[in-house]
Amino acid sequence: MDEADARAEFEALQTKIEKADHDYHQKDAPTLSDADYDRLKRRYLALADAFPILAKDGTRVASVGAPAASGFGKVTHAQRMMSLGNAFEDQDVEDFAVGLRRYLGLSSEAPLAFTAEPKIDGLSLSLRYEAGKLVQAATRGDGAVGENVTENARTISDIPQEISGAPEVLEVRGEVYMSHADFEALNARHAETGGKIFANPRNAAAGSLRQLDAEITRARPLRFFAYSWGELSEPLAETQIDAIERLASLGFQTNPLTRCCEQISELLAHYHAIEEQRADLGYDIDGVVYKVNDLSLQERLGFRSTTPRWAIAHKFPAELAWTHLEGIDIQVGRTGALSPVARLHPVTVGGVVVSNATLHNEDYIAGLDSKGAPIRGGKDIRVGDWVQIYRAGDVIPKVADVDLSRRPEGTERYAFPTRCPRCDSPAVREEGDAVRRCSGGLICPAQAVEKLKHFVSRAAFDIEGLGAKQVEQFHSDGWVKEPADIFELQQRYGSGLQQLKNREGWGEKSASALFAAIEDKRRIEFARLIFGLGIRHVGEVAAKDLALHFRTWSALAEAADLARAAALAHRAADEAEIVERQEAQASARRAKISEARNAAVATCAVAPDSQAAWDDLISVDGLGPTVALSLSDAFANPEERAAFDRLIAHLEIIEPDAPADDSPVAGKTVVFTGTLEKMTRAEAKARAEALGAKVSGSVSKKTDILVAGPGAGSKAAKAAELGIQTLDEDGWLDLIGQA
């Protein structure tokens, strides 16, 4: 798979994961099973690992869950509520343990114990106690900010209002759930009274906890299992298992199936034992969680962006179901991507009613992968087919297979549209791209609306009271066609307040609040502005890096303009390479490709200042040519550039703070080589990055410091040749103040 194919799949997965997170965390109505979500997330992370530039461009890798809903007060967690990495096979668990030993520098014989406990399928909750009293309860939200549900949590009998013998500050974390018996009784009562019928216990628990009226929550039979903690004024214990026992002694319910295991074989045996008991537990679980038992090792292992290194969830297998494919709908995204969605006869999969499933792209429908190789045995998907649906997480369900024996006579292969279903512009599939895209740009109403939704999203302008629903309404009414229109709403409509408050769903208070929120966002951080523009491939992380590098809008725009000629030369070279790759014989492929690229570059020679601007763009902390090309295309497109300019006229852009300068290695490029004796390579890398250094795997002119242990070899020789500062391990620790 090349980068273009990987990027197309990565973006599609990102969109699905965002929607699934929203459905699960905000609507309490997941559209996918746990198994499908995990499979999608696993593929997403695998692509990010194989193509690091994608991880930089992506936004969802660095987030957990979904933002807090607007109906509750917001709570900023003192310590983030993290998600968990996933394992799906026994081998994944063994690989997890091997990776931990490698990170910690432990031999295969050294002891490394784990705890194992059921993974409850409910709603995560953080309980804060101060001086023994419950003072706050908050949902996970997006991991950093959750919803204040304190009064509702007080109604749950498993949650103590006061505790004695606890640290002065104690945040207890766990899962709110509903037992099968209580769930069935609740639905039976609702059926009799005409109330809402819940699809599964998880939805019932989440919907019950997130009631604006705490008395409704009180009437719902919610339970709580404690399994972790957040902020502490003093440690609970030295091991995970002892800490859980300490929580139990304080009056919290902990899961009786929690075990401490010395060997991986014990973990796996306990997993399979729990799996066998699953149907008889009386509550929903979707796997088993393993955690390193020694809390000092947990501290050494630390965290990735959204998950702890010291824990993993071993998920149960996906659930499958067969149903009838009633139609194929085409959705158009903000970058013009045409995404096919299967319209299904509703079927229950894993306790969730599924009526739609992703079909990825036209190749997937045709039974081919992006290289033209057959998938599903080459079986295509047709309207009228019986298809197998699976859910492996909380994400959009997927069509896994087709039953040809039940295919109706007279069905025809699906003809993927070559024109946009929304604006009738040509839908073009570029060489090397798995996705067909509408070429209409901003004249396409679907793209315009999706871009506006992106513009007001949480990571972009985050305008209170202006969400996806309001954007659709304003666009349909002709009030907002592009981002600049948002800041002209009140001005252009004169008595805008009066016009808005007279519309359905709006009153004087909500209209005034919206205009105030819009005014508040005229001052905007540069990174949020860049991200909010919705430029293809420019994710949240890439936007921050661009903002830090260029610092002002004028500098970024000037660089994009100046680099345009070089960008076009780069694209011409790539296209020549693709043509030659298709035609070249295998035995001479490399030579011919090189010859074609060099010839293309020679015929597209550009001015030195344009080449320098291009080199500057692609050097932005590993941004790469794909993102740089998208940026160049956006600024060179007359309609988009004009829309940018109209928007900028309304804004005061806040420049990013200068990078931290309080570390002797901040901003420097460091390379580690040879054997390190006082820390593992992974620990050294993590510490250097925490101090603001960039860690590279190879020595170059850009390297500032080489840390060389015994057996440094060629890297030390090259560093000496380039005159690069070289330190031994003790010298490095002394430099960073950890000797």
Swiss-Prot record:
Principal EC category: ligase
What this protein catalyses is: NAD(+) + (deoxyribonucleotide)n-3'-hydroxyl + 5'-phospho-(deoxyribonucleotide)m = (deoxyribonucleotide)n+m + AMP + beta-nicotinamide D-nucleotide
**InterPro entries listed in its UniProt record:** BRCT_dom, BRCT_dom_sf, DisA/LigA_HHH, DNA_ligase, DNA_ligase_AS, DNA_ligase_CS, DNAligase_adenylation, DNAligase_N
A Pfam family of this chain = HHH_2
Q: Does the keyword Transferase apply?
A: no
- Residue numbers annotated as active site: K119 (n6-amp-lysine intermediate)
What GO terms describe the biological role, i.e. biological process, of this protein? Answer: DNA repair; DNA replication
From the Swiss-Prot or TrEMBL record, what is one GO molecular function term?
DNA ligase (NAD+) activity
Residues annotated to bind Zn(2+): C420, C423, C438, C444
State the Gene3D superfamilies in the record: 5' to 3' exonuclease, C-terminal subdomain, 6.20.10.30, BRCT domain, DNA ligase/mRNA capping enzyme, Helix hairpin bin, Nucleic acid-binding proteins
| Cellular component terms per the entry's GO annotation | cytosol
Q: Which cofactor does it need?
A: Mg(2+); Mn(2+)
| EC number of this enzyme | 6.5.1.2
Give the keywords, sorted.
DNA damage, DNA repair, DNA replication, Ligase, Magnesium, Manganese, Metal-binding, NAD, Zinc
Q: Which residues bind NAD(+)?
A: D34, A35, D36, Y37, D38, S83, L84, E117, R140, E175, K291, K315
Residue limits of the BRCT domain?
Answer: 660-739
The family note in this entry says: Belongs to the NAD-dependent DNA ligase family. LigA subfamily.
**What does this gene product do?**
DNA ligase that catalyzes the formation of phosphodiester linkages between 5'-phosphoryl and 3'-hydroxyl groups in double-stranded DNA using NAD as a coenzyme and as the energy source for the reaction. It is essential for DNA replication and repair of damaged DNA.
Q: What is this protein called?
A: DNA ligase
Question: Could you read off the lineage of the organism from its UniProt record?
Answer: Bacteria, Pseudomonadati, Pseudomonadota, Alphaproteobacteria, Rhodobacterales
Gene name of this polypeptide: ligA
